Curated annotation (Swiss-Prot):
One GO location term (cellular component): host cell nucleus
Organism: Human papillomavirus 39
Protein name, UniProt field: Replication protein E1
SF3 helicase domain location: 448-598
InterPro entries in the cross-refs: Helicase_SF3_DNA-vir, P-loop_NTPase, PPV_DNA_helicase_E1_C, PPV_DNA_helicase_E1_N, PPV_E1_DBD, PPV_E1_DBD_sf, Rep_E1_papillomaV, Znf_lg_T-Ag_D1_dom_sf
Main localization category: host cell
Assembly information from the UniProt record: Can form hexamers. Interacts with E2 protein; this interaction increases E1 DNA binding specificity. Interacts with host DNA polymerase subunit POLA2. Interacts with host single stranded DNA-binding protein RPA1. Interacts with host TOP1; this interaction stimulates the enzymatic activity of TOP1.
Length: 647
């Protein structure tokens, strides 16, 4: 079918566009319509009145668009003016009632979002959130403006002519309102933004680093609990008034022994960095309340932590800033700053001497590893070698080696001493002021002749065969264990227990003992002695089995035994009668009305007893010790230098 010439459609519409069918010369064998002239020229005169411009629809659309935009701009200006006026009288906390859809301040209409259809929507309440110069957000209720949308032209000319001007005018209105209602550079706004931040501590740490050029954590160590007490504290206080900051430097002195105060002006006000040593220990809560009262700053604007006491970098910072003109320092410099900054202290702390630690443990009679570790660590403030010990990564090894060496030295020292020297050595460790009479009175109270007891004690201390064991028996609560244990405590004797008799090593403590004791021997225990330990009771050499060591041949030390039965009178153990020296305690131990012992038996009284009966017990000095009255046994020393102390 041949193509028809002309246009399709009626050509109506507001856009002014129409379609023109091109006239194409005949190139095929198709038949041409008879009512058309193939040779006629198309001049377009028949289309001159095709579009009617009298309605002027485009001009009307542009005029309506301008009126709508003007109305929107005026409504926005009025709303902004109302918010600026009401912000002074509206609660900054806002209303908690539910609202409609929130409209952002940057949400503006453009020509591209406008359609020709006009539709009215139900008026709803909207909330405009306006920043309030750091004092919180103001929420102002207003009626939502009737939505009017206008369709855009397909060529986008309206957007180019009017859309840009609308956005520029709206943005200019917003900037003017912001400049009037909020100054982001003001100190008040900055400190309020700090308080409103989600992570206040991170914000304060960031501002501190920007101000001082170093991290706050480089100067402090962290206390997880707010109740932990400490005398030294580092405080960073934000937003302090300049006048209060100057007066604070004087007011704080009466609460502290040492203060180091730095104050710098920032956008948030004065930022104070302070190192303070209080007169007594305080926790974080107490320190915060005190500083808040003096500076009129909330505790949430403070960073409070104790200083690093072992960091040379932190100590050097306080030392260098303390001698500069940016700090106000009062009081004596803390010892931990002096220790970490003085050159000599630094040299001494860097070298650890194990022999010094061993000498300290030997002099103070520490042989347990836990006691050595704890007590030596307590000396770190006044002993450079102890401070170096704490800095070492081999503390456990040093403690173990120190305890081992101290035990070796103690064991060798004890073996080289005779019984007279050992008693003299133990007397030198006790204080004066004892009385020997309570011991004698207690023996008489139990019906024991003092002279017979002295004779038995003399043979007992010498380790005479068949006289090497003393047995004290009697009813319960007669003071047997109290009397014997006090003597063991004074002479540092060793206590063995029959409960461990199933082990081959239960007698191993006898290897290092000058004196031994077995408390509360029963019939089973006496049977064991009768079967296996007759030579030990005689005071002859015995063989001891030691754990992880070879058998040791040694003379059994003097043995003191308490019991509720008399082994001499029992027919089951006839062979023990000649090996035991027996004393009976028949009377109950006396107490006064306050439940205190009537006869006081302690180290002081035993010292006085041995000094009084020294000659009676035949505790004479050795010939190689000299003719003087004092026993000059030189104190052991394992470090260089002179030691003038005597034993």
């Amino acid at each position: 079918m041949a193509n028809r010439e002309g246009t399709d459609g009626d050509g109506s519409g507001c856009n002014g566009w129409f379609l023109v069918q091109a006239i194409v010369d005949k190139q095929t064998g198709d038949t041409v319509s008879e009512d058309e002239d193939e040779n006629a020229t198309d001049t377009g005169s028949d289309l001159a009145d095709f579009i009617d411009d009298s309605t002027d629809i485009c001009v009307q659309a542009e005029r309506e668009t301008a009126q709508v935009l003007l109305h929107m701009q005026e409504a926005q200006r009025d709303a902004q003016a109302v918010r600026a006026l009401k912000r002074k009288y509206t609660d900054s906390s806002g209303d908690t009632r539910p609202y409609g859809k929130k409209v952002g301040r940057n949400t503006r209409g453009t020509l591209q979002e406008i359609s020709l259809n006009v539709s009215s929507t139900q008026a709803t309440q909207t909330v405009y959130s306006v920043p309030d110069s750091g004092y919180g957000n103001m929420e102002v209720e207003t009626a939502e403006v009737e939505e009017v949308t206008v369709a855009t032209n397909t060529n986008g000319d309206a957007e180019g002519e009017h859309g840009g001007s609308v956005r520029e005018e709206c943005s200019s209105v917003d900037s003017a309102i912001d400049s009037e209602n909020q100054d982001p550079k003001s100190p008040t706004a900055q400190i309020k933004l700090l308080l409103q931040s989600n992570n206040k501590k991170a914000a304060m740490l960031t501002q501190f680093k920007e101000t001082y050029g170093l991290s706050f954590t480089d100067l402090v160590r962290t206390f997880k609990s707010d109740k932990t007490t400490c005398t030294d504290w580092v405080a960073a206080i934000f937003g302090v008034h300049p006048t209060i900051a100057e007066g604070f430097k004087t007011l704080i002195n009466k609460y502290a022994l040492y203060t180091h105060i730095q104050s710098l002006d920032t956008k948030q006000g004065v930022l104070i960095l302070m190192l303070i040593r209080y007169t007594c220990g305080k926790n974080r809560v107490t320190v915060g309340k005190g500083l808040s009262t003096l500076l009129h700053v909330p505790e949430s604007c403070m960073l409070l932590e104790p200083p690093k006491l072992r960091s040379p970098v932190a100590a050097l910072y306080w030392y260098r800033t303390g001698i500069s003109n940016i700090s106000v320092v009062t009081g004596d410099t803390p010892e931990w700053i002096q220790r970490l900054t003085v050159i000599q202290h630094g040299i001494d702390d860097s070298v650890f001497d194990l022999s010094d630690m061993v000498q300290w443990a030997f002099d103070n009679e520490y042989t347990d590893e836990s006691d050595i570790a704890f007590n030596y660590a307590m000396l770190a403030d006044c002993n450079s070698n102890a401070a170096a010990f704490l800095k070492s990564n081999c503390q456990a090894k040093y403690v173990k080696d120190c305890a081992t060496m101290c035990k070796h030295y103690k064991r060798a020292q004890k073996r080289q001493m005779s019984m007279s020297q050992w008693i003299k050595f133990r007397c030198s460790k006790c204080d004066e002021g004892g009385d020997w009479r309570p011991i004698v009175q207690f023996l008489r109270y139990q019906g024991i002749e003092f002279i017979s007891f002295l004779c038995a004690l003399k043979e007992f201390l010498k380790g005479t065969p068949k006289k090497n064991c003393i047995v004290i028996y009697g009813p319960a609560n007669t003071g047997k264990s109290h009397f014997c244990m006090s003597l063991m405590h004074f002479l540092q004797g060793t206590v063995i227990s029959y409960v461990n008799s199933t082990s081959h090593f239960w007698l191993e403590p006898l290897a290092d003992a000058k004196l031994a004791m077995l408390d509360d021997a029963t019939g089973t225990c006496w049977s064991y002695f009768d079967n296996y330990m007759r030579n030990a009771l005689d005071g002859y050499a015995i063989s001891l089995d030691r754990k992880y060591k070879s058998l040791l041949q040694m003379k059994c030390p003097p043995l003191l035994i308490t019991s509720n039965t008399n082994p001499v009178e029992d027919d089951r153990w006839p062979y023990l009668r000649s090996r035991l020296t027996v004393f009976k305690f028949p009377n109950a131990f006396p107490f006064d009305q306050n439940r205190n012992p009537v006869y006081t038996i302690n180290d002081k009284n035993w010292k006085c007893f041995f000094e009084k009966t020294w000659c009676r017990l035949d505790l004479q000095q050795d010939e190689d010790e000299g003719d003087n009255d004092e026993n000059t046994f030189t104190t052991f020393k394992c470090v260089t230098g002179q030691n003038t102390r005597i034993l």
